[in-house]
């Protein structure tokens, strides 16, 4: 059952079109929920790509994608096109950060401050 759900999600995301830099800039300048939603939806493939890099027997791909999506939404809220970065470059940091935080919290039996862990990863 879980694989069917994941496969349907992957198929649905594969149909989403990615935006070019011009479209990203115009959407981010609008600063409204509809524009942010379109920005997020057009970058869901990036989340899947990054999540697959962190997949292991201990980490379920669905969980990694879910956490990565949280990072993507956070990036959409904080993105400022005037800084000159592409959204995907900016978002990759937040996606990886959320995925790493999830893996750390899930797989550690001893609690180490997340800031200390981030220094080494």
Residue ranges and their predicted role:
Residues 2-112, 116-121:
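Alpha-helical promoter-recognition and RNA polymerase-docking modules of transcription initiation factors
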């Amino acid at each position: 059952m879980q694989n069917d759900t994941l496969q349907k999600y992957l198929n649905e995301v594969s149909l989403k079109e990615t935006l070019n830099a011009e479209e990203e800039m115009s959407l981010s300048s609008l600063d409204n929920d509809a524009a942010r939603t379109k920005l997020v939806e057009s970058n869901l493939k990036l989340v899947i790509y990054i999540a697959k890099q962190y997949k292991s027997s201990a980490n379920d791909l669905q969980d990694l994608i879910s956490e990565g999506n949280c990072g993507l939404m956070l990036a959409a809220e904080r993105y400022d096109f005037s800084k000159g970065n592409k959204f995907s470059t900016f978002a990759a940091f937040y996606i990886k950060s959320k995925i790493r935080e999830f893996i750390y919290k899930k797989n550690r039996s001893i609690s180490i401050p997340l800031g200390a862990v981030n220094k080494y990863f």
